[in-house]
Structure formats: C-alpha cells, structure tokens
Amino acid sequence: MTSNNPQPITDNGQLKILHIDSNHPLLKEQLQESGFINHEDFTSSKADVEKKIHEYQGIVIRSRFKIDKAFLDKATNLKFIARVGAGLESIDCEYAASKNIALIAAPEGNRNAVGEHTLALLLSLFNNINKASNEVKSGQWNRESNRGHELDGKTIGIIGYGNMGKSFAKKLRGFEVTVLCHDILENVGDQNAKQVSLEELQQKADVLSLHIPWTPETNNMVNQDFINAFQKPFWFINTARGKNVVTADLVSAIESGKILGAGLDVNEYEKLSFETLTGDMPEPYRYLLNSNKVILTPHIAGWTFESHQCLAQVIVDKIKALYC
C-alpha cells in the first residue's frame, strides 16, 4: 500500500531514513547502495524518537510502537512510513495521508508463509497432530480417540481474499475441496476460490479461515451472532488479527460443539507489538491453553526465514520505486 501523492526527495537527492526495528540486513544495505542515508535506533522510547524524528524523511518500522497523531505532528519532514509487514494498524493512516505521507507495507513478502501456516494448522486440527504427539510423549498410545478427518469433500470458507487469503486458497489446490471466498471488494474471486456472499459462505462452510485486517469495521467481528449464523458446526482458523474475534464467544462455541476446533496464530490478548501477551490471563485464554481442541502459535504464520528476507526486499523495492 502506498499513498497517491508521495513528496519529492530532498534537495541534495538523499533521504534520511530512521530504522526503529531490526530487520533483515539487506534492507539497510540496499537502501544505502541506492543513496539513502540510514540511521538505526532500536532501543529509544517513543518519546525520545519523537524528539529527533523531524530530522528524517523516512521511517522503517515493524510494530515497536504506534505511529499516532502526536508522533506525526513532530515528524515535520516525513515523506514515507514503511512497515515491514502486512498490516498498517499501528499507524494513524488517515492522519498520515492528510499530511501527504506515503504509506508502504509488504503483504507480498509473507503471504506464502501465511498460506502454508494456515494449511498446517488446518491439517493439524483435522488429524489431532498436537494432541496425539503430546499423548505419545507422555506414554499414551490412543488410536481411536485420535481418529482424524479428511479434507476431501469439505467446503473451505475464506473471509478476506487479498494476499493472504489467495495464498491459502492456492495451497488447497491439491485437495478435493470446494473453496469459497468473501471480501468487501467485488470481483476478487479467481480459479482457486468462488466469491460468494457472507450468507452463502456461512450456509456452506465446514471450515472458516480468517484473513482480514484489524479495523473498526472488523473489530470483534467473530462474535456469538456471527458464529451462530453458520449452518453447520465448523473448524476455525485465524492467522489474521486476534482482536477480530471475541475470545469468550469463541470458547462458548467450542464448548457447545458449534466450533469443532480452532487453530489460532493470533489472539485477542496480544500487545500491539505482537511480541508479548498482555500481563493478565483472562479465563477465556486459560481455556484455550488447556483445550485439546485448540492449537496456538505465537503470531508466527508470516515469520519464516524466507519471509524475513522477502519482506525486506519488498520494502526496498517499493521505496526505490517512489524515490529513485
């Protein structure tokens, strides 16, 4: 994503870029080779960064802190913000756009990783991989209680058919499944997924995989009413954003059998940085930790060695496309 009106480079032809999160070395190296001036500050507080941000025309971030209105007001010379990741929820995008600051993200950089991880969660759920492995390691040899399900013949529903949703659908091509997608944009369906209304998806899906950003419109979208609108019990996968789901309602649906199992790479209780959970441990989260119907991973769907490099390359290419 970029804004439509990026500002021109500085008079001497060089932009000063502040990197406030560590990333793959190629990002800084290639920008340096292209004539950009690069400074790093991975430890200063937001307040301390605000004191010097006026010196820079560009900033490269992941999710260390929020780029809010107060920060942007101090960034008087900022021309672009590049986030090494897919989402931009840590940035006040509307206010940045009002200041003609270009916004750059890299969903292309980790879409393959997310697609693979989503499929891994689904297959693990269907075949009780985690549960069976833990039992064998503890000396139990339980075959019948770990009898699994096959994907063939199932209908997979994907909500959010952008980079991540399309990647997951592509991974499903080797299975005899029906893939449906729903998106707020029209005409995004392709040879891998048929675009349908939300109502049709809820009527037909055996599996729901979420691939939407976290916005005011999607916040708490997966709640009791949303879940109950599904005609059949279903498996639920979330590799998108945790705050799109009301965890207490998810737990209730698992307990009632409406949701057969959940694979969650993200959860409602993550901090904005995605590096840690919030300090407390609410009861719904305790349930997720103890349920053998739930698989949890720590927001690593897009976190591979390959995507680490690819994300950086996408950001470099997009910055150079605007300013070289």
Please give the residue ranges for each predicted region.
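An N-terminal-biased, well-structured beta-alpha scaffold segment characteristic
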Residues: 4-104, 201-203, 223
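Rossmann-like dinucleotide/phosphate-binding beta-alpha-beta segment
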Residues: 13, 33, 144-232
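Short, Asp-centered acidic motifs that coordinate Mg2+ and/or phosphate
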Residues: 57-58, 80, 207, 235, ...
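Short glycine-/small-residue-rich Rossmann-like dinucleotide-binding loops
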Residues: 64, 86, 212-214, 240-241, ...
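Residue-level detector of alpha-helix initiation sites
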Residues: 66, 87-90, 105, 109-110, ...
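Beta-strand-loop-alpha-helix segment that lines the small-molecule cofactor/substrate pocket
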Residues: 72, 76-79, 91-103, 210, ...
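Phosphate-binding beta-alpha-beta segment of Rossmann-like dinucleotide-binding domains, i.e.
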Residues: 99-101, 107-155, 167-170
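Rossmann-like dinucleotide-binding domain for NAD(H)/NADP(H)
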Residues: 233-236, 241-324
